[in-house]
């Protein structure tokens, strides 16, 4: 079956935003206008098509990044837009990370009233990390307190972006009725709230001067990004709409400018123009750099590692990245993947080069938010899902077995909060284990383990809401009821002074003995560095084949620290000397020696406990400002800054996670439900001595 849509007509985009900016509503409208949805789903009615999990429909927030294909015609040309809906709640940043990795462009939705919110900044930084070109949509222009100018100013100040305004709103709040196209210098006016009666008119006389000024600024901005256009502009030549749009497309893809549009998605205003802009300014897979990877078993960035490049073409060897695993109630496990190069037909075998295992693509689906179509073949630049993968997980590369390549995987943050769960009945024990392991397969920031001392099942995640949603899914999808303990903080341990440690592990019990001898220098690293292992052995005093065992022994020993049994972090270990025995040495002996060495070194290294610190932003009416600040102080918080936003005050603070449990509930009752807050993990820092002592005593009593 030949390719239906040319590669340069494909757009892979994500719709990214803060919680209530109206992202799912915007996506819904896109699906409606592109003809894939017959009745518009409303988030506040709980029927939105993209939010297909019951938890999302109840909470009115988006949790899973569903990938949807939508057709769009512009000037008689057919395009295919693949949309990945991403959540805006901070506990789900992992979803945002993994979708950004496979997108070519993003639509960032802002709330016209609140402007740039904390989560918008986080998401913007994540998009910067993956070099994703984007356009902005200022939504909710019909709401009381909306201000397009303020929102654009915040995009400049807070995000450090260069907004290129391509539309101006006509009216605001109740009187918002359309937009001015600064390229064509025409007004688009909406005469109903269904987006059916739309007319193109002359710009209202009172808005003409502002529109002309904005158009001149836009032309100047675009001309500055391109030498050819700059010359024409300086010579006083009139640039055509085509030249300007071409210039803006190039500047957007090079991330020099960010086009800004506006509308009110709920009232069906501005969404069609947004779709036009997606097609006009965001890149096709051909506009993005070719994907690079390494041969299996090699690490990108190491010396002498050959970098393999795969061109974006149907004729290149098949190369794809699995970016999401979903347990679908109808077809079982689904693996969403993005094809970077080549094509694949259903029924073919591919190599999962990350795990060196074969995978058969029995059925390939193209997804609409919750109905699916079977397809025969997937081509470069497309997004699809395979049914029932046996060996593939998030971040894995699947490729042509004759041309192996491993793409850079997706990196996920470590979980910061944990709780103990137990099934309500003995009979549910097995069901709970299956449910939790399946949920952990889907979500790399969710971990499950059994506490070796208490035998309890412990689940870890990115925040209270994250774990709440997981337990909720376990109840609904797997019918397992669980009791949960109080949330616990994941502390860490580290050393504060360098330590030189020598350890011998010798065991003679008749027959073959055990012998491992290591000298390792341990040094503290800056917070957030993790673990660094350096092999400085010269002259083969420890044979090469035992070095990995030493590193593995250290890594395993770091999982449980010495002072309170928490993981050890931010340590550099340099193996510089040791010895071995021709007969008695083995990998096991060196692993045990390294493990003992680490434990002894931590004891001598003036160890200390570290606690996770959350970055909190609370928006409160003026009259509760004192209450909010006082509350932060009582939670060992550090106020970082305050500013006015409209008629509200924004307080930013760093607060230990241990003091943030139940914060949202307390905040609501203290401010009559009028303050809102969001928090995300920021860094680890040393725990005050008195508190550390308390925790150590509690742990040793258990």
Curated annotation (Swiss-Prot):
Residues 8-286 form the tr-type G domain. GTP binds at residues 17-24, 85-89, 139-142. It comes from the Bacteria. It holds the Pfam family EFG_III. It is found in: Cytoplasm. One of its GO terms (molecular function) is translation elongation factor activity. Catalyzes the GTP-dependent ribosomal translocation step during translation elongation. During this step, the ribosome changes from the pre-translocational (PRE) to the post-translocational (POST) state as the newly formed A-site-bound peptidyl-tRNA and P-site-bound deacylated tRNA move to the P and E sites, respectively. Catalyzes the coordinated movement of the two tRNA molecules, the mRNA and conformational changes in the ribosome. HAMAP family: EF_G_EF_2_B. Belongs to the TRAFAC class translation factor GTPase superfamily. Classic translation factor GTPase family. EF-G/EF-2 subfamily. This is Elongation factor G. It comes from Chloroflexus aurantiacus (strain ATCC 29366 / DSM 635 / J-10-fl).
């Amino acid at each position: 079956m030949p390719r239906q849509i040319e590669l340069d007509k494909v757009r892979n985009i994500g719709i990214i935003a803060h919680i209530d900016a109206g992202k799912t509503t915007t996506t819904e409208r896109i699906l409606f206008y592109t003809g894939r949805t017959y009745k518009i789903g409303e988030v506040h009615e709980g029927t939105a098509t993209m939010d297909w999990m019951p938890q999302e429909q109840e909470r009115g927030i988006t949790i899973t990044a569903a990938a949807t294909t939508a057709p769009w015609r512009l000037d008689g040309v057919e395009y295919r837009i693949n949309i990945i809906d991403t959540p805006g709640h901070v506990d789900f940043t992992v979803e945002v990370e993994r979708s950004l990795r496979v997108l070519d462009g993003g639509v960032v939705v802002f709330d016209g009233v609140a402007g740039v919110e904390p989560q918008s900044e986080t998401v913007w930084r994540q998009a910067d990390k993956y070099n994703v070109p984007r356009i902005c949509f200022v939504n909710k222009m019909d709401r009381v307190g909306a201000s397009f100018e303020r929102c654009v100013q915040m995009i400049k100040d807070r995000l450090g972006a260069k907004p290129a305004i391509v539309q101006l709103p006509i009216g605001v709040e109740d009187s918002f009725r359309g937009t001015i196209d600064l390229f064509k210098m025409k007004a688009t006016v909406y005469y109903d709230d269904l987006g059916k009666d739309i007319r193109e008119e002359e710009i209202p006389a009172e808005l003409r001067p502002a529109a002309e000024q904005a158009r001149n600024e836009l032309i100047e901005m675009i001309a500055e990004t391109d030498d050819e256009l700059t010359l024409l502009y300086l010579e006083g030549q009139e640039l055509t709409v085509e030249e300007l749009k071409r210039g803006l497309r190039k500047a957007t893809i090079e991330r020099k400018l960010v086009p800004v549009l506006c509308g009110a998605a709920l009232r069906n205003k501005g969404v069609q123009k947004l779709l036009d802009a997606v097609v006009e300014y965001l890149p096709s897979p051909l506009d993005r750099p070719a994907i690079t990877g390494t041969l299996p078993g090699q690490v990108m960035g190491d010396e002498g590692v050959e970098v393999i490049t795969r061109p974006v073409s149907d004729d290149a060897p098949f190369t794809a990245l699995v970016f999401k695993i979903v347990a679908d109630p109808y077809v079982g496990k689904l693996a969403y993947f993005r094809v970077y190069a080549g094509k694949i037909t259903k029924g073919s075998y591919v190599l999962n080069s990350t795990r060196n295992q074969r995978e058969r693509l029995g059925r390939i689906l193209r997804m609409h938010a919750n109905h699916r179509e079977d397809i025969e073949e997937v081509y470069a630049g497309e997004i699809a899902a395979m049914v029932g993968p046996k060996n593939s997980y998030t971040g894995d590369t699947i490729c042509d077995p004759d041309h192996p390549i491993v793409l850079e995987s997706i990196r996920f943050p470590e979980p910061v909060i944990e709780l103990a769960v137990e099934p309500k009945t003995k009979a549910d024990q097995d069901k709970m284990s299956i449910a939790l392991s399946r949920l952990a397969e889907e979500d790399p920031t969710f971990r499950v383990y059994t506490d070796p001392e208490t035998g309890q099942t412990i689940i870890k995640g990115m925040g209270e809401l994250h774990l709440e949603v997981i337990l909720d899914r376990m109840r609904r999808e797997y019918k397992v009821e669980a009791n949960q303990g109080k949330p616990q903080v994941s502390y860490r341990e580290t050393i504060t002074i360098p330590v030189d440690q020598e350890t011998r592990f010798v065991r003679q019990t008749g027959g073959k003995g055990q012998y491992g001898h290591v000298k390792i220098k341990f040094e503290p690293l800056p917070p957030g560095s993790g673990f660094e292992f350096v092999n400085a052995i010269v002259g083969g005093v420890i044979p090469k084949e035992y070095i990995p065992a030493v590193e593995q022994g250290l890594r395993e020993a770091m999982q449980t620290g010495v002072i309170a049994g928490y993981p050890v972090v931010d340590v550099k270990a340099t193996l510089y000397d040791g010895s071995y025995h021709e007969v008695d040495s083995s990998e096991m002996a060196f692993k045990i020696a390294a493990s003992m060495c680490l434990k002894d070194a931590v004891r001598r290294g003036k160890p200390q406990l570290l606690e996770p610190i959350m970055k909190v932003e609370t928006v409160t009416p003026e009259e509760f400002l004192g209450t909010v600040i006082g509350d932060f102080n009582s939670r060992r918080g550090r106020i970082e800054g305050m500013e006015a936003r409209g008629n509200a005050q924004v307080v930013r603070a760093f607060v230990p996670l241990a003091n943030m449990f139940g914060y949202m509930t307390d905040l609501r009752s203290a401010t009559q439900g009028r303050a809102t807050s969001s928090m995300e993990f920021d860094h680890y820092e040393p725990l005050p001595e008195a508190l550390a002592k308390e925790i150590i005593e509690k742990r040793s009593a258990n």
